Amino acid sequence: MEKIILVKPDLSYADEIIKYKEESLKENPLINGAAGLNNFSSIEDWLEELKKRSSQETVPEGLVPSSTFLGVREKDNYIVGMIDIRHYLNEFLKQFGGNIGYSVRKSKRNKGYAKQMLKLALEKCKDLKMKKVLITCDEDNIASEKVILSANAKFEDIRCIDGENIKEK
């Protein structure tokens, strides 16, 4: 398994971010853990949004401060995933989404990258002095459930949101 590091997105990764976005959007119109990347036509605008989201003073209304990272293979700077840490929970995130959202490039799944990314993100949560971290997944997303449980998570419950069951850990 190749070693992954978490890095803050910047313009030096622009081409790789675009490729990641394009590959992800072929599968789903929403890119989990990417802080709304799917809503931006330019990487510059998305990076500006990440700056706004990083601070309580500038976070857009309805959101909470967050830190977004690229999961990058250390040997070649290839983006295998993205992960977003929400610094605390609002009412929406308590029910849907939790503190951490992530995605792994479809072509790089089942290689242990998500486990590495989550482990590294949980270290970042400690740095942020977060005492408890809520991570959710769809009930039928067995791969994500295994990733979450690999981080010594404790199953909390299953919640029905808009007719879909969501597992909380």
Language-model segments: residues:
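Conserved GNAT acetyl-CoA-binding A-motif
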Residues: 125-136
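Short coil/turn motifs at secondary-structure junctions
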Residues: 88-90, 107, 140
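Conserved beta-strand-loop-alpha-helix junction that forms the acyl-donor binding cleft
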Residues: 135-145
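Conserved acetyl-CoA-binding loop-helix of GNAT-fold acetyltransferases
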Residues: 101-104, 110-123, 127, 146-150
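Short beta-strand element of the conserved SAM-dependent methyltransferase core
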Residues: 71, 168-169
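GNAT-family acyltransferases
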Residues: 1-99
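Conserved catalytic-core motifs of GNAT/GCN5-like acyltransferases
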Residues: 136, 152-168
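Polytopic alpha-helical membrane proteins, predominantly small-molecule transporters/carriers
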Residues: 68-72, 105-108, 137
